[in-house]
From Swiss-Prot:
The keyword Cytoplasm applies. The lineage of its organism: Eukaryota, Metazoa, Chordata, Craniata, Vertebrata. It is found in: Nucleus; Cytoplasm. Keywords: Cytoplasm, mRNA processing, mRNA splicing, Nucleus, Phosphoprotein, RNA-binding. It comes from Xenopus tropicalis (Western clawed frog). This is KH homology domain-containing protein 4. The C-terminal part is necessary for the interaction with the PRP19C/Prp19 complex/NTC/Nineteen complex. Its main location: nucleus. Residues 105-185, 237-319 form the KH domain. Residues 477-545 are annotated as: Required for nuclear retention. Residues 510-542, 565-612 are annotated as: Disordered. Belongs to the KHDC4 family. RNA-binding protein involved in pre-mRNA splicing. Interacts with the PRP19C/Prp19 complex/NTC/Nineteen complex which is part of the spliceosome. Involved in regulating splice site selection. Binds preferentially RNA with A/C rich sequences and poly-C stretches.
């Protein structure tokens, strides 16, 4: 008993529980239990334990807790066990993540899709310079995300692929809204510039605004607000005054003074109103010129209600312009017959005047006044008959006056100057500025007049002087010898020589006649020259030029003849001058012949009282 009562055996007392915790082989038995089972206070050793036993389990508990926590973490990471109520305490390792997420919740993010905007607008928005400008202006960061996709590519889009869009991120909603509004303004300007007469293919850019880490559900309500603002409805109203009068400025009437009418519609409805088409002055960016369509008003608005209101105001404006044009046309119709101006032709009508007028879109209710053709000036009929008279030009007062615009009559060929038609035998002695002989009568005078206009065509100048036999002619020499007018030239020497031979016999006859009659008559001399002209038909062209010059010399002869006096010297001089005047020309009247020829002619001319 003593043994059992005096000394305790180790088998008599239970083993300390701490020994099981220190053994690593016992740990798998704890796995089916919860993670906090081995941390519960009931597992503590009993109070009867010694101090040594208490100190040993305290160090073992810390080690066991660390190992258990590591194992539990590994199991939860693999998903074999689910976290319990103690899990928030266990996830204290990424404890700073919630604070970081909370700071990110303050950033507002918006996405503006620009995949379907016009090319020029898309290129402008994707430029870094434009995005930097938007960032400086709004305070939000703008970047390009996604890639451009066509309609076919968008239909086959993958889960991780998105169309081209702009990523806007800011600290507050106001900064993001400011950047988005700027982007919308750029897109609106690009759409308006690229709009054409056909229906637009741009459906608008979608804008998505959300908080980055937040779920999609709370962000859905503001999304339609931004998306609806970018969907533009468009319409156009044709003016309908393509064939208006050129003096009626349709563009100015529609736009108003300084585009005030269209600006008023924009302020009232908030729509974009522009004038486009032919004559609008709006240059299309694609073609670089005006559209081929007739003039129309282009209307664009984000909402259909605003578009309808703007369209109604534009219709009222066009009605006012049409009524004003009708008043303008009526005013022209009432004033045109009074002033006598011709109006432009109707639509599809052939103009009655050679002037071109643009086709008009109205019907003129009055007869078109055609300007009368200018009446031709009254032509004074006159007939140029064969004149019989002096070749001297008539007085200016005698020539019949005619109207200035009268054109020459092609049926009556005339020559200018037209000689004065006078009765036979009439003369104009008042026009004699030189000692000419009075005009002869009859056939000889007619031949002179008809050939007078041809003198200017046959005049020739030479430095040679033909030899002549009548060297006894005396008179005044007109001008130098080398510039003397020789008429038709040297072929005339044959006639001159023949006439000179005949003049010798005539001088003898006249000398015999002078003894009986004093003074000798001058007319028989000219009468005797007519047979001489007829006797030389081979020189018809030569004889046509001489009669005028013979008349000049004859005039000089009568001017030198003295009718009173009985001096034989005067008779001799008279005979010499008479023979020279009847045969010589005006160009050799004063030529001095050699002394040998003068002596030969002086022999038959001695006075009658010295005759043997």
């Amino acid at each position: 008993m003593s043994a059992g009562s005096g000394r305790r055996s180790k088998w008599d007392q239970p083993g300390p529980p701490s020994t099981t915790l220190l053994l690593p082989g016992v740990l798998p038995a704890i796995v089916p239990f919860t993670a906090g089972a081995f941390l519960s206070p009931p597992e503590m050793p009993p109070v009867t334990a010694t101090c040594e036993s208490v100190s040993a389990p305290s160090g073992a508990l810390d080690a066991a807790a660390a190992v258990a926590a590591k194992i539990n973490a590994m199991l939860m990471a693999k998903g074999k066990i689910k976290p319990t109520q103690n899990a928030p305490e266990k996830v204290q390792v990424p404890g700073k993540a919630p604070s970081a997420a909370k700071s990110k919740d303050d950033l507002v993010v918006a996405e503006v899709e620009i995949n379907d905007v016009p090319l020029t607008c898309r290129n402008l928005l994707t430029r870094g310079q434009t995005q930097d400008e938007i960032s400086r202006m709004s305070g939000a960061a703008v970047s390009t995300r996604g890639r451009y996709m066509t309609a076919e590519e968008k239909a086959k889009i993958g889960p991780g692929d998105r169309p081209l869009y702009l990523h806007v991120q800011g600290q507050t909603r106001e900064l993001v809204d400011r950047a988005v509004n700027r982007i919308k303004e750029i897109i609106t300007n690009g759409v308006v510039k690229a709009a054409t007469g056909s229906s637009p293919t741009f459906n608008g850019a979608t804008v998505t605004v959300y908080h980055q880490p937040a779920p999609v559900a709370p962000v859905a309500p503001p999304k339609p607000q931004f998306q609806s603002g970018m969907h533009y409805v468009q319409d156009k109203l044709f003016v309908g005054l393509e064939h208006a009068v050129a003096t009626f400025n349709v563009k100015e009437k529609v736009e108003g003074p300084g585009c005030s009418y269209l600006q008023h519609i924009q302020l009232e409805t908030g729509a974009k109103v522009f004038l486009r088409g032919k004559g609008s002055g709006c240059i299309e960016p694609a073609s670089g010129r005006e559209a081929f369509e007739p003039m129309y008003i282009y209307i664009s608005h984000p909402k259909p209600e605003g578009l309808a209101a703007a369209k109604k105001l534009c219709e009222n404006l066009l009605q006012t312009v049409h009524s004003e044009y009708n008043r303008f046309v009526n005013q022209i119709a009432t004033t045109a017959p009074l002033t006598g101006y011709a109006q432009p032709p109707q639509i599809g009508a052939v103009p009655m005047q050679p002037q071109y007028y643009p086709p008009n879109g109205y019907q003129t209710g009055f007869p078109v006044v055609q300007q009368p053709a200018p009446q031709p000036a009254v032509q004074v009929p006159y007939v140029v008959s064969t004149p019989i008279g002096s070749p001297v030009p008539p007085l200016p007062g005698v020539v019949p006056t005619m109207a200035a615009p009268v054109p020459p009559v092609p049926a009556v060929p005339t020559r200018y100057p037209i000689p004065q038609v006078q009765p036979p035998g009439s003369t104009v002695p008042a026009q004699l500025t030189a000692p000419y002989m009075p005009a002869p009568h009859g056939k000889h005078a007619a031949a002179v007049v008809t050939q007078a206009p041809l003198q200017g065509q046959k005049r020739r100048f030479t430095e040679e002087l033909p030899e002549e036999r009548d060297s006894g002619l005396l008179g005044y020499q007109h001008g130098p010898i080398h510039m003397t007018n020789l008429g038709t030239g040297f072929p005339a020497q044959s006639k001159v020589d023949g006439a000179t031979i005949k003049s010798d016999t005539m001088v003898v006859k006249e000398r015999e006649r002078d003894r009986q009659l004093m003074p000798p008559p001058g007319m028989p001399v000219s009468a005797q020259k007519e047979p001489e002209e007829k006797s030389s038909p081979g020189t018809v062209g030569v004889a046509d030029d001489y009669p005028v010059k013979k008349l000049k010399s004859s005039g000089k002869t009568f001017g030198l003849v003295a009718y009173a006096g009985d001096s034989s010297d005067e008779e001799e001089d008279h005979g010499v001058l008479k023979s020279s005047g009847s045969l010589s020309q005006g160009w050799n009247a004063g030529y001095q012949y050699p002394a040998s020829q003068q002596q030969q002619r002086a022999k038959p001319q001695m006075p009658f009282w010295m005759a043997p």
